[in-house]
Design a protein with these regions (language model features):
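N-terminal capping segment at the start of a domain
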Residues: 26-28, 33-59, 75, 80, ...
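Soluble metallo-hydrolase cores and metallopeptidase-like ectodomains found primarily
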Residues: 24-27, 116-143, 148, 208-304, ...
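Short helix-loop-beta-strand segments that form the rim/entrance of peptidase-like active sites
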Residues: 319-346
Length: 475
C-alpha cells in the first residue's frame, strides 16, 4: 500500500463508522442516473456544426447555451440565460512573410507556423521587427524589456511567460498588458512565439494594431543571422533574469482578415435546485464549468470537445443525479455553464457578482475544465476547502478516480473560472482529468468528440455528485 492509500485508509477510519454507508445510501438513486455514454452524447451535441465552436458572442455559442438550458429545464429545474456584453471576432484568413537580409524570404504556413490571435485588428502592415524578450515593461519591479530598443513603427516579437514564477508578474503576463505596452511605445503589432500554434481569443482589439503568433520553429528561421535559436534565448532569459532585447534582421509583412462584432452578447446558463431547509436554502453550492470554446475560423471548426464540452456534460450529468436522487440537500445547488472563459473569464466574473436574488451566499464552488480524457481526475483545492478533504477522499470509495490534490494559494494569469470565487473567499475545488491528450488538441481542430471517454466522465460525475451533495447537506 502506498503512502496516499495509507493516508486515505486512516481518513476513512477516522470518520464515523456509518459515514461512508450513509453517504452512499443518500446518493445511490442519483448515482444510478449518471451514465458516461450520455455525457459523451452531450459532448458530441455541443461540439457539432450547429454550435460553430461555441465562441461567446457568436450565434453558435447562443445555440449551445439555449440547448444546454433546455437540458436543465427538461429535468424540472428552474433556469435562465444570464446575459452580459461580450464582443467577439471571427478570423477569415491571413498571411505572414518574413524577409531576411533583404533577400531571403520565408512564408509562414497558416495554422502550422502562424495564426493571428482572435482579437487582432484587420489590416496589412510591413515593418521591421525587434525581439523584446518577455515583452514586459515593469520599472516598478526593476525590469524592462523595452529599455534599450526602439520599437516605434516596428513589430515586437516576444515569448509568453515571465522571468520566474513569482506571482508579482501576473499582470505583466496578460495579453492585454503586453499589447497596451507595445502599442503605447509606437509598435505596429505584436508577434508571440509559441511552441505550438493555437487559436486564442483572450484579448481586446486595439485599432490598427495586428497581433499574431508564430511557431518556435518559424522563429528559428528568423534568428539565423544572430546564430541563435528559440531555445537559446529562452534559456538565457530564464537563467539571467535580465532583458536580452535586440533588433531582428527580418522585415515582417503581416496581413489579417477578420470580422469584428463589438456589440454582441454572451450568456451564462444558470439553473438551480432549491434546498430543503427553510433557512439554509438561501445558501448555495455552485457546480459549474465553461461552455464556450474558441469558435470556427479560417474555414475550420475548432470543436472544443474536451475543452470544455466535457466539463459542461459532467455538470449536466450531476444536475440529473441531483434531480433523480429525490432527497434534496439542505442547501440549494446552482448549476452554471459559463461563457467567455476563453475570452478572459467575463462570464464567471459576471455570475459571481450577479447571483440569482434568492441566494444570499455561495457556500462552495466546484469547477470542471477538461475532464474527458484519462483515468484519474486531478484537483486544485483552495485552503478554505481543505477542511472537507476527508469527505472528498471518502467520496472516491469504489470509484478510484481521484488523482492528485493540489492546494491553490495564489492566482495566476491562467487560473480560469475559479478566479472570481477565490477573490470572494468561496471555498472551491477545480477538476481536470490527467490525459494524456494529443498535441493537436488544445484550441485546435483536433479537439473532437470521438476522443472523450465515457468512463472518466461517469466516474468524475459520481465522485463530485457525492461530494457536492455532502457540501450542500452540511449542518
Amino acid at each position: 500500500m502506498n503512502i496516499r492509500n495509507s493516508f486515505l485508509a486512516l481518513l476513512l477510519l477516522a470518520l464515523p463508522s456509518n459515514y461512508v454507508a450513509s453517504q452512499t445510501a443518500a446518493t445511490a438513486k442519483g448515482e444510478s442516473a449518471i451514465r458516461g455514454r450520455d455525457a459523451v452524447a452531450t459532448v458530441a451535441r455541443l461540439s457539432d456544426k450547429n454550435t460553430a465552436g461555441r465562441l461567446t458572442g457568436h450565434a453558435g455559442y447562443t445555440n449551445a447555451a439555449k440547448y444546454s438550458l433546455s437540458r436543465f429545464t427538461s429535468l424540472g429545474l428552474k433556469g435562465q440565460l444570464q446575459a452580459y456584453p461580450q464582443p467577439h471576432s471571427v478570423l477569415d484568413g491571413g498571411s505572414l512573410v518574413a524577409t531576411l537580409n533583404e533577400e531571403k524570404v520565408h512564408t509562414a504556413e497558416l495554422l502550422k507556423e502562424f495564426l493571428p490571435l482572435l482579437f487582432s485588428d484587420s489590416g496589412q502592415t510591413k515593418a521591421p521587427s525587434v525581439f523584446v524578450g518577455w515583452g514586459i515593461h515593469a520599472p516598478e519591479l526593476g525590469y524592462d524589456d523595452y529599455a534599450r530598443v526602439d520599437v516605434k513603427g516596428k513589430f515586437v516579437v516576444c515569448f509568453r511567460g515571465t522571468p520566474d514564477n513569482d506571482p508579482k508578474w501576473v499582470y505583466h503576463d496578460e495579453h492585454r498588458t503586453r499589447m497596451k505596452v507595445a502599442s503605447e511605445r509606437g509598435a505596429v503589432g505584436l508577434i508571440y512565439v509559441y511552441s505550438t500554434v493555437i487559436a486564442h481569443p483572450n484579448g481586446d482589439l486595439i485599432p490598427k494594431f495586428l497581433v499574431t503568433m508564430i511557431s518556435d520553429s518559424f522563429f528559428d528561421k528568423l534568428l539565423t543571422a544572430e546564430g541563435s535559436t528559440t531555445e537559446d534565448l529562452t534559456k538565457q532569459l530564464r537563467q539571467t533574469k535580465k532583458p536580452a532585447s535586440f533588433p531582428l534582421d527580418a522585415v515582417i509583412d503581416l496581413s489579417v482578415k477578420a470580422r469584428h462584432f463589438p456589440k454582441s452578447e454572451g450568456y451564462n446558463v444558470v439553473s438551480w435546485l432549491e434546498g430543503s431547509d427553510p433557512k439554509l436554502k438561501e445558501e448555495c453550492v455552485v457546480i459549474g464549468g465553461h461552455l464556450d470554446g474558441v469558435g470556427d475560423h479560417i474555414g475550420l471548426r475548432f470543436p472544443g470537445a474536451e475543452d470544455n464540452a466535457s466539463g459542461s456534460a459532467v455538470v449536466i450529468e450531476i444536475a440529473k443525479a441531483f434531480v433523480k436522487n429525490g432527497l434534496r440537500p439542505k442547501r440549494s445547488v446552482v448549476f452554471v455553464l459559463f461563457g467567455s472563459e476563453e475570452q478572459g473569464g467575463h462570464g464567471s466574473a459576471h455570475f459571481a457578482e450577479n447571483l440569482p436574488p434568492q441566494f444570499k451566499k455561495m457556500s462552495a464552488f466546484i469547477n470542471f475544465d477538461m475532464v474527458g480524457m484519462g483515468t484519474k481526475v486531478n484537483t486544485s483545492m483552495s485552503e478554505l476547502m481543505e477542511t472537507h478533504r476527508g469527505k472528498l477522499e471518502a467520496s472516491d470509495q469504489g470509484l478510484s478516480v481521484l488523482g492528485n490534490i493540489r492546494m491553490v494559494r495564489t492566482l495566476g494569469v491562467r487560473s480560469g473560472d475559479i478566479v472570481p470565487f477565490f477573490k470572494k473567499g468561496v471555498p472551491l475545488i477545480g477538476l481536470s482529468s490527467n490525459g494524456p491528450r494529443p498535441e493537436d488538441l488544445y484550441h485546435q481542430p483536433g479537439d473532437t468528440h470521438n476522443l472523450v471517454q465515457a468512463e472518466i466522465m461517469e466516474k468524475t460525475s459520481k465522485l463530485m455528485f457525492r461530494f457536492g451533495y455532502e457540501l450542500a447537506n452540511l449542518d
